[in-house]
Amino acid sequence: MKFALIGQDIPALIPTLLADLLFAGKQAADVWVEEKNQAMQDVLQRYGKAIIEKSGLAASLTADGDRAAVLSGADCVIYAGDCMAASRFRQDREALSGSGEDDPGLTDQARVNGGIEGLLHTLRQGEMVMTLCEAMQEHCPGALVINLGQPVARTTAIFEAQGFRCFGLGRTPLKGANGLDSLCKKLHTPERDVQATIAGLPGFAFLLGLKKDGADLLPKLHKLARKDELGRLTRRWLDWYEAIAIGDVTDHAEFLPAQEDYIPEEEPTFGESVEQRKERILHMNTVGDKGASDREGMMAQLLLLSKAPPIRPMQLALALLRGEGLTVDGVTRRNDGELPQLPKYAIIEARLTLQKGQVMPHGTQLPAPLVEICGEIDETNRLAAKAAMGDRSALRECIEIDPALSGLDRLYCQELVDRLIELHDDVITRL
């Protein structure tokens, strides 16, 4: 079994990827990491060698700058890349800021996944994903894709359109200011004791059911929301969509018209900070130098695992490749009956249940107002993905229908997007 790991966020995920592969999954495999920096190649390979020796399995980790070698014969590609996300976001935010009172700009459209900047993010990311897909079609045409690249709905749509079976993992709705853990605390109920139904779109998920020992807890939560105890945005969207927004509610706001009481984050986090990267490399070097069985190496490994992102792509990949059973919350994929009120080709986010590696749809029902807005956002997402693949007419249609642009002059938005595309013409080459 061969795994190809692609993207600048992969090194931060390596500790959990290897732990889930070798120790939880007990799977011998060849792991290839695309890494062009020779010093980082050495860090990753020494770290990987120490962890593999600890596992006792006949596995290998190779870091290489040659994409063809990394991809050749891969059974699964895990993608966690982006296109200079932080610096490009800052460029666009400045361009959207306007030039004075006569030109106030559209800074509320400087969003990571939705609105105008979400579209530009998609176009830049699309260049990277399309280039990867072209290489995969040559070197591993049957590979499974686990996609961690943002905006996850749109990058997943691109992989699917290029003929790859793709499952995405974004920020989990179980955590965050309005995550399931926080909502359960409001109800003074341990999260482990409840059965939750969470579904919607990537970054736009809602709590549709909450039970404990057969008792319905959702009415209590709705009551708290209507008392403004879960925040103004949560109450507003409960009134609009008849459901509780779950996860970071600011994620939901990215796909909706500007809200007076919501200001997009000026400096969103993209991957590791410089300090986090330095610390990770230090701990990886310790494991590589001391070994994973040495006390100092073990402590460094525990620190790496404790600070790794919460998503577990390797668990999902192994279940799909080995035809096993698994249940995972918040998985992005093609709908195919999971949410029967939305088209089968919609890119949705919901709990994934696998039986012998096959997806078992739950047939979850959404409130009617939520069906409508999810349909609009999904269509916008898929048009943005088509635009990222080089379809200029899809770009125009995306701007015409995007609910995040409601109330704005769509022609002005089109002109603004065209100017921003010119700003990034070194990386946006398909339009």
Labelled PLM ranges:
Residues 183-431:
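Long, compositionally biased stretches enriched for glycine and/or charged residues
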Residues 71-81:
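N-terminal Rossmann-like NAD(P) cofactor-binding module of classical short-chain dehydrogenase/reductase
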Residues 1-34:
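N-terminal Rossmann-like dinucleotide-binding module
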Residues 22-55:
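Glycine-rich phosphate-binding loop and adjoining beta1-alpha1-beta2 segment
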Residues 10, 36-40, 173:
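Helix N-cap at the beta1-alpha1 junction of Rossmann-like dinucleotide-binding domains, i.e.
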Residues 87-161:
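Rossmann-fold NAD(P)-binding glycine/threonine-rich loop
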